[in-house]
Design a protein with these regions (language model features):
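Phosphate-group recognition and catalysis centered on beta-loop-alpha active-site segments
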Residues: 2-338
Length: 338
């Protein structure tokens, strides 16, 4: 090996070592800068958190009492098998979703808890329908862009796999629903998909006109602001917060610390301020620890969507938690005739 070759090898090794040392130095300096900024920001973050906690005490709404909640949910008796399931959209696998037929079927089977979707039309009418129903009917866009006249032309029975077993069904208005509840012991979980000011004002006027609304309906929303606006006017109204899966939640999962902080803010600040009684959590994000954390702040968790008999038995016997289900035929302890 010639002297020139040896010199080039030594020069190459020197370059590699120099670049490696430079990279390590850069990473160390960047880490040191992050630590410095974090240490400087911690006092300010702590101060901000204290201010938010103090301010929340002045805006906090009182929660409805547990007795009122139990009367709506049918108590909290583990031996009462009808207590655990909440029929999602009236049991969308068993009957046309969000329909009068689905509600009547739940009543006939002895189940009293039903979750229905609600939106508001372009003509300012609250309707019991989900946007997926409109898509099946060939209508594009949100419910707020469709008129009531257009919706009345839809036969939702035709859109269901078992539609031939049912009479033609029209989309219900909220007024139709409240009249349908008369003479029944049903409790309706009304999941509002639209948290616009138009929807909130229409709901307020509906509650004002129907004294039984707060005794028969639990309003659920993904928006804490919408819940706060409703409960500020009607503090006796029982509300539930729907925790949806979103890209931001997926990002938070990458950091255990961020996830813990995010959950703590919702449980210890937002939930007490808006005075919710229920929270809806995906079964994939639920465990005994999460359940205890929510119950400790006076909020009852409900999981969604549970359709397997084995899963239902697990949530009944182990988790002691109510669940949304798309089918009442799969209740593990009951043989339900269709």
């Amino acid at each position: 090996m010639s002297i020139g070759t040896i010199f080039r090898v030594i020069k190459m090794l020197y370059s590699v070592l120099w670049y490696t040392a430079s990279l390590v130095s850069f990473m160390f300096n960047a880490f040191w800068l992050c630590c410095t900024l974090a240490s400087a920001g911690i006092p300010w973050a702590t101060l901000l958190l204290v201010i938010v906690c103090i301010a929340s005490k002045f805006f906090k709404l009182s929660s409805p009492n547990e007795k009122q909640l139990n009367s709506l949910l049918g108590g909290n008796v583990a031996d009462d098998l009808s207590f655990w399931p909440i029929a999602h959209r009236g049991g969308a696998y068993d009957a046309p979703e969000n329909s009068a037929a689905a509600i009547k079927k739940c009543t006939k089977r002895g189940f009293r808890n039903v979750l229905l979707d609600a939106g508001i039309t372009a003509c300012n009418e609250i309707v019991i329908v989900h946007k997926s129903t409109l898509q099946k009917a060939g209508l594009c866009g949100s419910i707020s862009r469709v008129t009531m006249e257009t919706l009345q032309n839809i036969n939702i029975s035709e859109l269901h796999p078992l539609g031939s077993q049912f009479e033609p069904e029209k989309i219900l208005t909220l007024g139709n629903l409240l009249r349908l509840l008369e003479g029944t012991n049903l409790t309706i979980f009304l999941l509002i998909s639209d948290s616009s000011s138009k929807m909130i004002e229409k709901l307020k006027s509906t509650i004002k006109l129907h004294e039984s609304f707060t005794r028969r309906v639990i309003v659920c929303s993904k928006s804490p602001v919408a819940i706060y606006q409703l409960r500020k006017v009607y503090p006796e109204l029982i509300c539930g917060l729907w925790c949806d899966k979103s890209p931001s939640r997926i990002i938070l999962k990458t950091s255990t610390l961020l996830t813990s902080i995010y959950g703590a803010i919702f449980r210890n600040i937002i939930a007490p301020v808006i005075g919710i009684s229920l929270v809806f959590i995906s079964k994939d994000e639920f465990n005994l620890h999460i359940s205890e954390l929510w119950r400790n702040v006076g909020v009852r968790p409900i999981v969604y969507n549970v359709n397997s008999p084995n899963e239902k038995r697990y949530f009944q016997k182990v988790m002691k938690t109510q669940y949304l289900t798309d089918s009442l035929r799969s209740e593990p302890q009951l043989l339900v005739k269709t």
